[in-house]
């Protein structure tokens, strides 16, 4: 998957499969697994895992969605000013995922790369937390 993550102001041409996968993710408001997407969209004509994975890969490449690696799920990108790489919090109790953007965090990663003469092709930061609701209960 590509590390490019930009939102174009121009509407990019999406295939039918990409549009229906994107619509499902937008309407869900939560991370979805590929096989759940396949099951949910069979009536729309998506009949094979390959169709779903191709659509998901392209949507990630276009910066429309993110893959949450640790839970092997996909979520809509909610950050209109998103950078190349993004971080998430995942509640250990309820499973709620939140996209976060923090300049200090990304600056720290940039410093790490520079100090160690590395070239990051992409990164995916996932923090396991107790969300506000679960912390109270």
What are these regions (language model features)?
Residues 1-23:
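Short alpha-helical segments that sit at the start of domains
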Residues 31-41:
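Short acidic, hydrophobic short linear motifs in intrinsically disordered regions
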Residues 52-62:
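Basic amphipathic alpha-helical segments that dock to polyanions
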Residues 48-49:
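Short coil turns linking two alpha-helices in DNA-binding domains
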Residues 20-28, 40, 62:
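Short amphipathic alpha-helical elements of helix-turn-helix/winged-helix folds
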Residues 14, 27-33:
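Short capping segments at the starts of secondary-structure elements
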Residues 66-67, 71, 75-137:
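Non-DNA-binding regulatory cores of transcription-related proteins
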